[in-house]
Amino acid sequence: MSENDSIKPHGGVLVNRITNVDPSGLFSITISEDLANDVENIADGIFSPLEGFLGQQDFESVISRGRLANDLAWTIPIVLDVDEETANKMKDAVDVLLQNPDGIGIAVLHVEEVYTFDKEKTAKGVYGTNDTAHPGVAYTMSMKDFLVGGKIDFIQRPNDTEIRKNRLTPKQTREAFAQAGWKTICAFQTRNPPHVAHEMLQKTSITTRDGVFVNPVIGKKKSGDFVDEVIVKCYETMIEHYYAENRCKLGTLHTQMKYAGPKEAIHHAIMRQNYGCTHIIIGRDHAGVGKFYDPMAAQEIFSDYPELDIAPVFFPAFFYCRKCLTYTTPKACPHDNDDKEQISGTALREMIQNGQAPSQFILRPEVAQVILDHPKPFVD
């Protein structure tokens, strides 16, 4: 079955950096699990048009303008940070073997440049703040002092694990969408288990499109977020019990949450365009954290990127109204807050921590049970 060609990858070409390069004798460094995920995402075209880690010109353009040096939309810097000792060694190396934490050589980096960067300027450019209470800012300030730019060649997948079983490449998703006969696909980005309002939102999107691609983020998250295994198992359970056959596809996206609000909303849209999605759901405070962003900023930023082929679908918050007897939105429901079953992430976490099953209007019973059965459903 041919790949879904209803939407082109960002930049026009789906990157493929998977090769058979011989790494024998190369200087090697070990990178974090999150950086290893970035390398694999580059290789598979999830980060198209990137073919490697950003060089200085592209890096500075991204943090100052939200675009690559060639003016193509790109809002989140994909970089490899190293300490001074490693940087000095890499300056003299043409090719470097990148090993994941398991010691597996996953890729060869073709070193093009090694450069320093201003951490405060970077944090301000990406996150809009230098407040270290923001997890993205704290991460940026903890980065090593040098960045290495260059293309990568991916040579070996990491070991298979349970959490990787739903990881799909853009080639695989495009083939799956084509096989299902889908021409219009709405992506749903999430870092949480599905509550019923999200289910209703996804099903609403299906009514005018061929299918929905549920794409949870798997990777490092902030304390208090749900752990990856819980998120995936909850979605598997909900899809099994509550979705029409051949209308929902689940695939995990292995990348670190940045909590960059509007900038990350654009990044999320670009990745889902590369997967073959024609639309993406963008809710209030998409990819936000705390009170750092205006709730509508993640929707408003799309007016700065009209050239994106993927179309954002803006939804207000859904809730259950006891008088309307349905899930609805503030635009459609005239009733008082006392009649509304609102969804509070804080309240939901407190209920689960106390072993209480949330209301069926908040979580499907089967989904709630998955969470309650897990010994440690939250990130420490």
From Swiss-Prot:
Pathway: Sulfur metabolism; hydrogen sulfide biosynthesis; sulfite from sulfate: step 1/3
SUPFAM superfamilies: Nucleotidylyl transferase, PUA domain-like
Keywords per UniProt: ATP-binding, Nucleotide-binding, Nucleotidyltransferase, Transferase
EC numbers on record: 2.7.7.4
One term of GO molecular function: sulfate adenylyltransferase (ATP) activity
GO BP annotations listed: hydrogen sulfide biosynthetic process; sulfate assimilation
Enzyme class label: transferase
Protein name: Sulfate adenylyltransferase
Organism field: Nitrosopumilus maritimus (strain SCM1)
Source taxonomy: Archaea, Nitrososphaerota, Nitrososphaeria, Nitrosopumilales, Nitrosopumilaceae
